[in-house]
Amino acid sequence: MANFFSLGGNQEQQHQEISSSQALVPTESNNWFLYRNEHHHHHHNQEIPNTYKGFELWQSGNTPQHQHQHHQQQQQFRHPIYPLQDLYSTDVGLGVGPSRSGFDISAGDHEASRSGFVMMRSGGGGISCQDCGNQAKKDCQHMRCRTCCKSRGFQCQTHVKSTWVPAAKRRERQQQLAALQQQQQGHNNNNNNHKNKRQREDPSASSLVSTRLPSNTNGLEVGKFPSKVRTSAVFQCIQMSSIEDDEDQLAYQAAVSIGGHVFKGILYDQGHESQYNNMVAAGGDTSSGGSAGGVQHHHHNSAAVATATTTSGGDATAAGPSNFLDPSLFPAPLSTFMVAGTQFFPPSRSP
């Protein structure tokens, strides 16, 4: 069933319902009619597509010729062979292109000034782009796709800047970051090595409490020091106690100057002279324990005073120049302790 509803622009706003078989007699040239097509029509075994069904606006003319043209257009859309497929691409098309919702407008070049054709269609979907015919962006106020909208220079909120980076640029950026990290790591390693080297060269920069005395080896060559020396020295008798033994032990400490260098040490009791001579003849160790408890002796420096003669008062006299040193400078071994009133100096470490 096809019905016409008058949408004329006359002052009386007449409403007419005319059957499709009756003649169409408009009152004015500016009248518009709403045509409703509810049936399927076939032409050459072809069915009217769903996009061509719905409401159609028709504008009438003043002469029967216009009526005949409208009747021909009505028959054309009753039995179409997809006539609107290329409507938006023709030079006479005035519409927004094919879309599932919206409206299309087309007018003939011979009557573009007086009559036109408007077709309204219903359905779901979005708006087509006015330039390329693709689906336009939903929120675009220019009714265009993003590419066409940006190419025309329109300021639209749908122009979102893409955060995608090509794979080649990503690899280049990763290589640059890796090279920068390696360079920073190498710079840090060089700084650490330089700092460690400075600490080794400058022992005073160490945070240890005990400082190492610099060792001067100048003049310690064998040619500058004689194998035997006769000199006079003062031997001071001291009483020492061992940590492992409660019994006290007597020892002598002395210091001599040989070749401009000071040699100092403590002489421990090695037992009776006959026993010591037997041990030396037998090849025994002169630093073994004595008769006072078998205490192990350290810093046995008898070479410098091997030729000295010990008296009962603790004084040793020998031929040679008189060179006496303060006995309080003589250190004691770490494994022993001296009686009260005796100063203790730890021995210096040799390199």
UniProtKB/Swiss-Prot annotation:
It comes from the Eukaryota. Residues 129-156 bind DNA. Residues 1-23, 170-219, 286-320 are annotated as: Disordered. A motif (Required for homo- and heterodimerization) lies at residues 258-261. Zn(2+) 1 binds at C129, C132, C140, C145. It is found in: Nucleus. Keywords: Activator, DNA-binding, Metal-binding, Nucleus, Transcription, Transcription regulation, Zinc. It holds the Pfam family DUF702. Transcription activator involved in the transcriptional regulation of terpene biosynthesis in glandular trichomes. Binds to the promoter of the linalool synthase TPS5 and promotes TPS5 gene transactivation. Acts synergistically with MYC1 in the transactivation of TPS5. Forms homodimers and heterodimers with LRP1. This is Protein EXPRESSION OF TERPENOIDS 1. The gene is EOT1.
